[in-house]
Amino acid sequence: MSNKPESLAAAFIGHLTYERRLSPLTCTSYARDIRVLLKYLSGSDLAQVQLPAIRQVIAQLHGKGLSSKSLSRMLSAWRGFYHYLIRDHHFKHNPCTSVRVPKSAQRLPHALSPDETAQLLNFVSNDMLAARDKAMFELFYSSGLRLAELTQLKPADVNYEEGTVRVLGKGGKERIIPVGEQA
């Protein structure tokens, strides 16, 4: 195995995909975050990177407007990458362990008002796709499903007699959700 940063990153993503069996979206996010690290540390020996270099990268990204949440997720990926390098590639230290991300004010998500929701759901169409979309909007609004969960639903997941839908959530957890009358 090469000690080139790109090879180490590819091996890490392979580890996440095939050994830890993380979801494809999670692996894609980790890969993107590791590419950012490699871009900022371009030309550096990953085994020799120290805490000040990681802090500098975080400061630069924060200065470019990345949110604390994005920086925290990114730093978590970097910590995991270095943890993997220590365990599988005999690196000596993790320069990311004591880095803290600048905190920002937490904002509540914007929710649709009842009027906005009614406007969204009160369209009339004889088109089959429009009927499907309306049912999806209604289910999404009334059930609290994640968008990824909604898009993965199959007709076989719907129990019309009981008025429920079987959802495969994060971590492969299955749950049964009641379906509102409108959906």
PLM features per residue range, with description:
Residues 1-183:
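Conserved catalytic core of the tyrosine transesterase superfamily
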